[in-house]
């Protein structure tokens, strides 16, 4: 399991701003992945979080290219591309320079978001990427003092434990909820101890960059800060370079907490836990729960995708069936219309029975012979002396009727 050490565990004094560092060295960008247990139900009350620095780069193009490869290799974690010496919100894809997701559609959306973010940054250059610390007003101070007196009273009477007291300082929740949260936290801590022998904290293959230092800004130690922030202070090839950089930073920023770490390993951070082994156990358990959660999400996603595919296939079959029915209906209507047209054409033929009687002494036999001719001689030749009012389309319609009778 990974090891990490803190160069400074001093609790920071109140800061007015958290600003960017001046440019340093030839490494300008780096890739980082986060583990945020609060995003998983089982571990959201564990006071632990983790990060892994993958590598450092000279240019953004090289960093983005490597981030794509890292994302393919470590499919369970998003890979962020950020700039050395700048302040960023913890595990916040909307506040980073670039991020690689597993899904290509999300990557396309990220590019669109980045374009709009760049436009906003151009309009807000006066802020210089600083996180302003909000000064609490008198009313807020009075309310916080009342809450503290209530916590002290409950603790002095033994109504809440020390862990619940410390938790109430961080979480703005009623006492009964704090007790429930404390129970969940204790269960998670016990599970973490049981899982200590199984290592879920993977390590990257070695790269040229070996060590680094980082500052993590917590709302617990910086009054008025509303979110976790971090700033990578340097990446180095040797331990000597690292120590030299940390010493210089302490002289310039005496109130900053500066942590050292090894590149390519998961590093734990906690506001309340000073024991590195305990922190690693909690981070290890959090990683297991996170990986289980990712696997479940993928399984549910595949189920939803299969169900959606089946629904689409069924809908396609229904549409195809309806189309066939519509075509048959159209054919029936066309045939019916043709028959009606033929009947109309036949009814418009003039009566020539008197002419036939004067030229033929046996009309009955002629009629009989005509029927026989229909049955045995194929297509009937229409008489040349037929009324010219019957046009070619009428002749064709009559012929269709005769063919229909014959068949």
Curated annotation (Swiss-Prot):
Residues 96-130, 287-345 form a coiled coil. Keywords: Coiled coil. Residues 318-331 have a biased composition (Basic residues). Residues 344-370 have a biased composition (Low complexity). It comes from the Viruses. Residues 302-317 have a biased composition (Basic and acidic residues). InterPro entries: DUF5832 (IPR043872). Residues 302-394 are annotated as: Disordered. This is Uncharacterized protein R435. It comes from Acanthamoeba polyphaga mimivirus (APMV).
């Amino acid at each position: 399991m990974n090891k990490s050490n803190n160069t400074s565990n001093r609790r920071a004094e109140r800061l007015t701003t958290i600003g960017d560092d001046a440019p340093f060295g030839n490494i300008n960008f780096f890739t980082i992945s986060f583990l945020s247990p609060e995003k998983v139900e089982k571990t959201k009350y564990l006071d632990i979080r983790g990060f892994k620095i993958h590598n450092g780069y000279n240019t953004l193009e090289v960093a983005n290219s490597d981030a794509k490869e890292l994302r393919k290799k470590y499919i369970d974690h998003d890979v962020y591309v950020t700039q050395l010496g700048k302040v960023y919100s913890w595990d916040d894809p909307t506040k980073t320079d670039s991020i690689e997701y597993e899904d290509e559609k999300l990557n396309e959306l990220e590019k669109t978001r980045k374009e709009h973010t760049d436009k906003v940054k151009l309009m807000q250059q006066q802020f210089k990427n600083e996180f302003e610390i909000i000064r609490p007003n008198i009313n807020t101070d009075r309310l916080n003092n009342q809450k503290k007196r209530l916590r002290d009273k409950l603790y002095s009477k033994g109504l809440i434990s020390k862990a619940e007291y410390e938790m109430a300082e961080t979480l703005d929740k009623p006492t009964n909820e704090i007790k429930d949260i404390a129970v969940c936290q204790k269960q998670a801590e016990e599970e973490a101890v049981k899982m200590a022998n199984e290592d879920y904290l993977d390590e990257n293959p070695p790269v040229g960059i070996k060590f680094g230092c980082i500052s993590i800004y917590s709302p617990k130690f910086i009054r008025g800060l509303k979110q976790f922030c971090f700033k990578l202070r340097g990446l180095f090839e040797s331990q000597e370079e690292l120590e030299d950089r940390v010493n210089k930073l302490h002289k310039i920023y005496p109130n900053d907490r500066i942590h050292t770490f090894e590149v390519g390993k998961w590093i734990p951070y906690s506001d309340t836990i000073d024991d590195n082994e305990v922190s690693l156990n909690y981070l290890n358990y959090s990683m297991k729960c996170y990986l289980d959660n990712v696997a479940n999400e993928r399984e549910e996603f595949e189920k939803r995708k299969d169900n959606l595919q089946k629904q689409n296939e069924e809908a396609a079959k229904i549409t195809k069936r309806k189309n066939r029915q519509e075509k048959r209906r159209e054919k029936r209507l066309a045939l019916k219309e043709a028959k009606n047209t033929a009947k109309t054409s036949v009814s418009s033929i003039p009566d020539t029975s008197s002419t036939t009687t004067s030229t033929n002494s046996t009309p009955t036999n002629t009629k009989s012979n005509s029927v026989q001719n229909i049955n045995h001689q194929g297509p009937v030749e229409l008489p040349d002396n037929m009324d010219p009012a019957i046009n070619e389309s009428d002749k064709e319609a009559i012929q269709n009727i005769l063919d229909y009778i014959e068949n």
